[in-house]
Amino acid sequence: MAASSLNLLLILSLLTFISLQRSESLSDNPSLTLLPDGFDWPISHSDEFDIIDGEESFEVTEEDDGVTDRRSLYWRRTKYYISYGALSANRVPCPPRSGRSYYTHNCFRARGPVHPYSRGCSSITRCRR
């Protein structure tokens, strides 16, 4: 019994030694490149192609480290679905020109416009309300 456990221990140590040697030899091969944990991609969406003096800047400063956690929620994929009730024929989701959003829950019971127009005159609106 002692001889069989000694043989088992010897075989396990030999297999461990061979696997360690094999994993080290893979990293020496110049055709294989090991990727780091994170890619150096731009963190923010708005300034990902900022060009300063002809060079693209993709550097993240220490000040931005607290912001990256907040912005990471932006990069998650979300799926939006339209309900079968909204797709049904001959159904107007909300009265036209009511100022209510199509996404307002039960917009026929809601009173008053959601976002009333309160901007002043400009050359675009030509003071029309």
UniProtKB/Swiss-Prot annotation:
Pfam families: RALF
Signal sequence segment: 1-23
Induction text: Accumulates during senescence.
Record's GO cellular component terms: apoplast
Function: Cell signaling peptide that may regulate plant stress, growth, and development. Mediates a rapid alkalinization of extracellular space by mediating a transient increase in the cytoplasmic Ca(2+) concentration leading to a calcium-dependent signaling events through a cell surface receptor and a concomitant activation of some intracellular mitogen-activated protein kinases.
Post-translational modification: Proteolytically cleaved, probably by S1P, a subtilisin-like serine protease (subtilase).
Site (Required for proteolytic cleavage) residue list: R70, R71
Listed GO MF terms: hormone activity
Originating gene: RALFL34
A single BP term in Gene Ontology: calcium-mediated signaling
Keywords: Disulfide bond, Hormone, Secreted, Signal
Protein name: Protein RALF-like 34
Keyword Signal: yes
Source species, domain of life: Eukaryota
Organism: Arabidopsis thaliana
Propeptide: 24-76
Tissue/organ expression: Expressed in roots, stems and leaves.
Subcellular location: Secreted
Similarity annotation: Belongs to the plant rapid alkalinization factor (RALF) family.
SS bonds (residue pairs): C94-C107, C121-C127
